Curated annotation (Swiss-Prot):
It holds the Pfam family Enolase_C. Keywords: Cytoplasm, Glycolysis, Lyase, Magnesium, Metal-binding, Secreted. Belongs to the enolase family. It is an enzyme of class 4 (lyase). This is Enolase. Catalyzes the reversible conversion of 2-phosphoglycerate (2-PG) into phosphoenolpyruvate (PEP). It is essential for the degradation of carbohydrates via glycolysis. Its EC number is 4.2.1.11. It is found in: Cytoplasm; Secreted; Cell surface. It comes from Clostridium novyi (strain NT).
Amino acid sequence: MKTFVEIVDVYARQILDSRGNPTVEVEVELEDGTVGRAAVPSGASTGIFEAVELRDNDKSRYMGKSVEKAVENVNEIIAEELVGLNVFDQVALDKIMIELDGTDNKGKLGANAMLGVSLACARAAAEYLGISLYQYIGGVNAKVLPVPMMNIMNGGSHADNNVDLQEFMIMPAGAKSFSHALRMCAEIYHTLKNILKDKGLSTGVGDEGGFAPNLESNEEAIQVIIEAVEKAGYKPGEEVFIALDPASSEFFNTETNKYELKGEGRELTPAEMVEYYAKLVEKYPIISIEDGMAEEDWDGWKLMTEKLGGKIQLVGDDLFVTNTKRLSMGIERKVANSILIKLNQIGTLTETLNTIEMAERAGYTAVVSHRSGETEDTTIADLVVAVNAGQIKTGAPARTERVAKYNQLLRIEEELNAMGEYRGLKAFYNIRK
């Protein structure tokens, strides 16, 4: 087998994401004509510590959201450095781009430019070898199929309603396999739609395919989901669990140091906010809370971890932004017990893999995630299996840009056959009871 395969072309273009906003797509061509292609996602609620997504800010084009500059950076700066190099040397390719950029936050070339190239290189290498992307990234040990963390109800900045918490999700940890888990989720999703219809509530879907009905409170959203789980014939707390993503940085007032639950007309101190979650956890089968406290409220995070870290999964998204520096601060301070992994928060495959490795060494789980602005690219489905992460967050079983990831996981499950493993509740090795 050849160990050096030359990159002969790196080319980027502007395409549209699932919200109709421009994003970057990159193609990497190899000496034998093999092409690897990758498209980059984009978030709505973004952490302030995320790597920079370069946009043109020219109001006369796509409301200022075009990415021509990022595309130009690939075609004129990055391509020049990578053409002639070995596609199999992922670490070196990513390192060259990081050095070319030279900033802490990918502000010069843009994380969207760099990630497109990084992923297209990996895909080209896998294509050349004639193997699946998860096998190329993860090797022979890549075999764990993830428990879906499926967003079926929205509030916060993903919706226009009275619900403050951003995402209400189901996790079919009691399923026998990934395909069984997906079926359970789809059945619950359709049942939920019918329940909302019967109540005369909206069944329009948000950016990630979840419903955004105008409910009275956060608790009502949980109750309606539990009703859907039971009506679909499943047992809450045994087969299906609830996960929340409050995205609390969005409703944290840094001046008053309070969490403003506007839908409920309440302002809570960090300690009261932790108490609020503790009561929900006691009352409902909640297994995971993501970004329960704001990205800069380290004291609040500490309180929440001390109170709930032994009972449920506490995921840092805005807190950690897929960044080893931020994650090591969290590990040191004993804050959270899980990290959300979003490729575009950091900007290269190598750095993403380093973050996942650091999390797992510290006993934290890694939940591989989509963004609210997605494309038909299915890299995250391969990534979650490649690193045996055991959990994926990629939206409702609706909207093709979400379903594409689930369908890719069905193919991977089929390919792995008896080798594949669906861990269910064992995926939560971070909950130290």
